[in-house]
Every structure is written in structure tokens, then in C-alpha cells.
């Protein structure tokens, strides 16, 4: 269903606890990618079985294959090839993928993201991105060896609502910062998505920081 029907994601299903802080999951990405691919192979391991699906140019080929697993295994593997009849410009710089994967590693602490780039037939360059302590390690990396202050990390989780007539939702916050006379940078992420222009979180952070200093 996720690969064949638009808006089939479970992000907004009540209570939605599995997806409260997730990027995407509206039911668009997987389906749109499948329709825009020359082929897509999906393998899902769960509940003691391995499930396989094969698509070609937006159509499922054959039936779903179900194979019992002999050992406990979970996870999903998706392989696809963009359809050149859909994507006419595929000259995407490798640095773009490096940047995206590094940022995902920053906000998904302890998860390794591996980039494999084919430099010649059968030969790959591999680069891993891993931040065991998430944004804390990222701030320490940016600040270098001689920051004015050591990195500080705050975490909090709250419940609230935008208006009295709106349902409550959870907010989970992670903030890491330090003072440095060499690096001047502020970055913001929402549900693991990098906010290039900062948006509301940037304004809120600046106002709160100045207010706290004034109060002190």
C-alpha cells in the first residue's frame, strides 16, 4: 500500500506515537519514488518472514514473495534506479549526498550512514558518517580544540497545543551550543530535516537566548 497509494503513511494516525518526531511518513516519498523509477526492489524482514516486491516503471511485476526466515531478522532494504524518462537532469554533485547524510547522522545519534560512490566499474569509495552523541559531538567538531567554552547540551520533552481548540502534541527539544571566537554558526533541524533558512526555530532561539541573558 505504501508503495502504490499516495498518502498511505501512518504519521497522522492516532495516537501516532511511532512517528511523532519523524521526517516524512506522510505517504508521499516511497510512492512517488516508485512511480518515478525504472525499477524498484523492496525487501522487508519482519514477523519471521521475508517479503519481496518488484516494480517496473510504476507497475508491480508478479506477486509478493513471502519466505520464512530461519533466524530473527528485521529491517527494510529498498533499491531503485531513477527513470531517465522522468529525470532529465541527473548531474547531482557527490557533495550534495555527503551533506545530506552527514546532517542525518548528526540528528540520528549512534546511527551510521554509509555513502558508496562507484568511481569505476566495480570499484567503490566508501565514507561513513557517525555521531555517537549526536549534536553534542557535532558542536565539539565545529568548535575545534580551543573553544571559549566547552559544548553544553540540553534535552527536554513537553506537551502543548497551539490553541485551546487544537489537540495536544509532544515537543522534543535538543539544544547544543558553545562559545567560540573562530566559528560563528547557528543551525536548526525539525524532525531531522535541516532548516536551511532557520525559520521559526531560529527566531525563537535568538529571542529566548537574549531574554535569558537579560534576566540574568
Spans of model-derived segments:
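Amphipathic, well-packed alpha-helical segments that form the structural scaffold of globular domains
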Residues: 3-8, 79, 206, 210, ...
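GHKL/Histidine-kinase-like ATPase module
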Residues: 95, 102-104, 110-216
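Active-site-adjacent bridging/hinge elements
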Residues: 3-12, 75-77, 174-187
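GHKL-type ATPase core
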Residues: 5, 9-143
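Short amphipathic alpha-helical face segments that pack within enzyme cores
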Residues: 1, 31-35, 204, 208
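A broad, low-specificity signal for short, low-complexity segments enriched in glycine/proline
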Residues: 3, 38-41, 197-203
Amino acid at each position: 500500500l505504501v508503495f502504490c497509494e499516495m498518502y498511505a503513511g501512518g504519521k497522522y494516525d492516532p495516537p501516532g506515537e511511532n512517528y511523532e518526531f519523524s521526517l516524512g511518513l506522510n505517504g508521499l516519498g516511497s510512492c512517488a519514488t516508485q512511480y518515478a523509477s525504472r525499477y524498484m526492489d523492496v525487501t522487508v524482514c519482519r514477523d519471521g518472514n521475508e517479503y519481496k516486491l518488484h516494480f517496473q516503471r510504476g507497475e508491480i511485476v508478479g506477486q509478493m514473495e513471502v519466505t520464512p526466515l530461519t533466524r530473527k531478522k528485521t529491517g527494510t532494504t529498498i533499491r531503485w534506479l531513477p527513470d531517465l524518462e522522468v529525470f532529465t537532469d541527473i548531474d547531482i554533485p557527490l557533495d550534495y549526498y555527503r551533506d545530506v547524510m552527514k546532517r542525518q547522522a548528526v540528528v540520528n545519534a549512534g546511527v551510521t550512514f554509509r555513502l558508496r560512490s562507484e568511481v569505476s566499474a566495480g570499484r567503490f569509495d566508501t565514507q561513513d558518517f557517525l555521531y555517537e552523541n549526536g549534536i553534542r559531538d557535532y558542536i565539539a567538531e565545529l568548535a575545534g580544540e580551543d573553544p571559549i567554552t566547552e559544548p553544553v547540551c540540553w534535552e527536554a520533552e513537553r506537551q502543548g497545543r497551539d490553541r485551546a481548540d487544537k489537540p495536544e502534541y509532544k515537543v522534543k527539544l535538543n539544544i547544543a551550543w558553545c562559545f567560540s571566537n573562530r566559528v560563528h554558526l547557528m543551525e536548526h533541524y525539525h524532525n531531522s530535516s535541516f532548516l536551511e533558512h532557520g525559520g521559526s526555530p531560529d527566531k525563537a532561539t535568538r529571542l529566548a537566548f537574549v531574554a535569558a541573558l537579560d534576566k540574568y
